[in-house]
Structures are given as C-alpha cells and as structure tokens.
C-alpha cells in the first residue's frame, strides 16, 4: 500500500470509518489526509490539514459523522483540536477546521471554541452521555491534555471543561498545588 506522495512519510494518525470500513490516515510532515479503500485497493487524497509539520492523532465519532484531529506536537507550541465532518451523500470528509483551542498559542483555560486553551491534546475517546439522550449528538469527547497534566472533556457544543487533574501551564515536573503533605 502506497502511503502518500511526500518523500518523508510517517503515518501519525489513523482511524477506520465505522460505516464504510475505509481507513483514513494523516502523514507527516505535510498533513495530507488519505483514504484507503480495502475493496478497490485504492488510496485517495481527501483533504489537507490547514497546518503542516504537526503530529496529529485522529479519533472518529462512533456514528462516523465526524472525526477529531488532535494536535499533539508541533514546533510552534500551539494547542487545538480540529474536526472533519463526514458527508454521507458525497461519501467524503470536509477540510479540517479548528473547534477547540487555537493555532496561534497554547495554555490552560476552560471555555468554548477558541476561548479554550489546550497544551498538547493527545489521546481521546468518545463517551455516551445519558444527559444528551435524544439529542443529535449524544457523546462527549474525553481527551488527555498532556502538557497541562489533566483529562478534559469536549462537549458536542464545543465547550472544553477539565474533568480530572489541574493544568499548571508549565512543563515543570511536580504538583500544581505544591509538594505533597508528609
């Protein structure tokens, strides 16, 4: 299977669409997103992430309606989560767009959309929330905010809240609240 067109090819994120069975993956450093169709054995370039030279992690929604791309690492130190929407009529994903955090900086702050600050979102999972029963989207997205040392939630409305841990907006080791009591 040919991975892509660039000379330096590293797959940095991938997922299998729950409805079509196709695999989608992003390559470093150009951040092109490809689709591989197991039936036809074809590779197709479907989108280009708006930022390059970033390590992305990809997680598809359980319904396949969209996928999140988590910006885990880059040389500029920004922190965000972008999203690609799936169109079942055209059978294609949209160009990724940022839904939480910012491409121009990082930090620690709960909030909605670009008002939230993230610093190294890496791994995540969708969790069905019974409070959303009957809503269009019934899932929260729990993710690790690595350099803020916490677990956070991205709601379907784009709100980021801290679930566990406390961000200290620092790469210093130790506890945000000071040393442990002896």
Regions found by a protein language model. Name each.
Residues 75-76, 130-138:
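Intrinsically disordered, low-complexity Ser/Thr- and acidic-rich flexible linkers and loops
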Residues 20-21, 42, 64-66, 122, ...:
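Structural signal for glycine-centered tight turns and loop->strand junctions in beta-sheet-rich domains
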Residues 17, 23-29, 61, 67-77, ...:
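Conserved beta-strand positions in repeat-built beta-propeller and related beta-rich domains
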Residues 1-12, 40-54, 91-122, 159-182:
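Gly/Pro-rich loop segments of beta-rich domains
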Residues 14, 58, 124-125:
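Hydrophobic core register within WD40 beta-propeller blades
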Residues 31-34, 79-82, 149-152, 159:
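A short loop-to-beta-strand structural motif that recurs across blades of beta-propeller domains
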Residues 38, 83-91:
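Short loop/turn segments immediately following beta-strands, especially the blade-tip
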């Amino acid at each position: 299977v040919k991975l892509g067109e660039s000379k330096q090819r590293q797959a940095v994120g991938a997922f299998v669409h729950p409805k079509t069975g196709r695999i989608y993956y992003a390559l470093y450093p150009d951040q092109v997103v490809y689709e591989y169709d197991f039936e036809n054995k074809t590779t197709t370039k479907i989108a280009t992430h708006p930022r390059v030279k970033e390590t992305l992690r990809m997680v598809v929604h359980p319904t396949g309606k969209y996928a999140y791309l988590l910006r885990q690492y880059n040389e500029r130190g920004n922190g965000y989560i972008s999203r690609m929407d799936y169109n079942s009529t055209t059978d294609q994903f949209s160009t990724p767009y940022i839904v939480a955090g910012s491409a121009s900086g990082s930090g620690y702050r709960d909030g909605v959309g670009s008002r939230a600050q993230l610093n190294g979102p890496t791994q995540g999972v969708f969790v069905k929330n019974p409070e959303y029963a009957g809503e269009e989207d019934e899932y929260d997205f729990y993710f690790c905010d690595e350099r803020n040392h916490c677990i956070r939630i991205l709601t379907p409305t784009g709100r980021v809240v801290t679930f566990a841990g406390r961000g200290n907006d620092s790469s210093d080791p130790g506890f945000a609240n000071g040393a442990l009591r002896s």
